[in-house]
A protein has these predicted regions:
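Signature of N-terminal electron-transfer/Fe-S-associated modules in redox systems
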Residues: 1-161
Length: 161
């Protein structure tokens, strides 16, 4: 077992994990943060995207021991303290950017990272290119793209830019 310490959604966490434990397993099984989904186990679907030190990472590709000393944010920790939803989450709700919802946490975490890297004025082409690592089996992506564009603009108006 390996002892790791990290910050998850602003809270210090210490855990003893098998060195082969994936970050997604630590989050879901040990910390009960089940918003991070496992869709493929092969790093293709993007349902497991979280932020590590502010950057989007597929949690199924990262060993938990590699997150030792780092800050991890999951969909559960995305909204500001006291706020019911992050502006990107609100945009997905308002623009019907989900159907079954399984891919939604990963889409939203990827979208927030996209805004941080590329800014608030995102073209449809840029959004679609950036979503290549995220799969949705239910939609044609149009409402997801619209949700991300609206969420990016909403983030510009908030202090979560």
């Amino acid at each position: 077992m390996a002892k790791i310490s990290l910050i998850v959604n602003g809270n210090p966490v210490t855990a003893n994990v098998d060195p082969r434990t994936l970050l997604v397993q630590l989050l879901r099984e040990n910390l009960h943060l089940t918003g991070t989904h496992v869709g493929c186990d092969t790093s293709q679907c993007g349902a497991c995207v979280v932020h590590v030190d502010g950057k989007a990472v597929k949690a199924c590709t990262l060993l938990a021991v590699m997150a030792d000393g780092h800050e991890v944010k999951t969909i559960e920790g995305l909204a500001a303290d006291g706020a019911p939803l992050h502006p990107m989450q609100e945009a997905f709700r308002e623009h019907h950017g989900l159907q079954c919802g399984f891919c939604t946490p990963g889409m939203i975490m990827t979208a927030v990272d996209l805004v941080h890297r590329k800014g608030h004025d995102l073209s449809e082409q840029v959004i679609r290119e950036e979503l290549e690592g995220n799969l949705c089996r239910c939609t044609g992506y149009q409402n997801i793209v619209q949700s991300i564009a609206a969420g990016a603009k909403a983030m510009a108006k908030s202090d979560l830019a």
